[in-house]
């Protein structure tokens, strides 16, 4: 097989998906934004680290904004216009990521918090002495 034909077959096919789901996982150290179709297949994703932030800068709201913007752009290439948002975690980039999805041009249908809560599970980390 020639090199040109081989590279053409590797390119991802562009789907036309009008609606999807946006999963925002915001931890104390990072923010991951994943956009899927309605059945859960990943269309596009991004994270604070993938955008180019390292170390403690990954946990900032600005890094979450940039990650959400990059994920929204990759989803819009597949034709996504409307998303339902699921937010998980206690991080600082939760609201900023949602706002950034809106300003990127995605219409937000609903926002739901899916943060897991322990019913007396593992002992949480001790408070920091700063």
Swiss-Prot record:
Mention any one GO cellular component term assigned to this protein in its UniProt record. ribosome
Q: Which InterPro entries match?
A: Ribosomal_uS11, Ribosomal_uS11_bac-type, Ribosomal_uS11_CS, Ribosomal_uS11_sf
SUPFAM superfamilies (alphabetical): Translational machinery components
**What keywords tag this UniProt record?**
Ribonucleoprotein, Ribosomal protein, RNA-binding, rRNA-binding
Please name the GO terms of the biological process aspect recorded for this protein, alphabetically: translation
Instruction: Give yes or no: UniProt keyword Cytoplasm.
Output: no
- Keyword RNA-binding set for record: yes
One GO MF annotation is: rRNA binding
HAMAP family cross-referenced by the UniProt entry: Ribosomal_uS11
- Similarity section: Belongs to the universal ribosomal protein uS11 family.
What's this protein's function?
Answer: Located on the platform of the 30S subunit, it bridges several disparate RNA helices of the 16S rRNA. Forms part of the Shine-Dalgarno cleft in the 70S ribosome.
Could you give the subunit structure recorded for this chain?
Part of the 30S ribosomal subunit. Interacts with proteins S7 and S18. Binds to IF-3.
The name this protein carries in UniProt is: Small ribosomal subunit protein uS11
Q: Which organism is it from?
A: Tropheryma whipplei (strain Twist)
């Amino acid at each position: 097989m020639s090199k040109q034909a081989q590279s053409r077959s590797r390119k991802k096919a562009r789907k036309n998906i009008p609606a999807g789901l946006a999963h925002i996982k915001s931890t104390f150290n990072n923010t991951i934004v994943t956009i899927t179709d309605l059945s859960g297949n990943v269309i596009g994703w991004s994270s604070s680290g993938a955008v180019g932030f390292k170390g403690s800068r990954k946990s900032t709201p600005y890094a979450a904004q940039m990650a959400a913007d990059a994920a929204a752009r990759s989803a819009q290439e597949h034709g996504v216009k409307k998303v339902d948002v699921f937010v998980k975690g206690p991080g600082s980039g939760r609201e900023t990521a949602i706002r950034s999805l809106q300003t990127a041009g995605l219409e937000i249908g609903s926002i739901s918090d899916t943060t897991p809560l322990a019913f007396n599970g593992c002992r949480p980390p001790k408070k920091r002495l700063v």
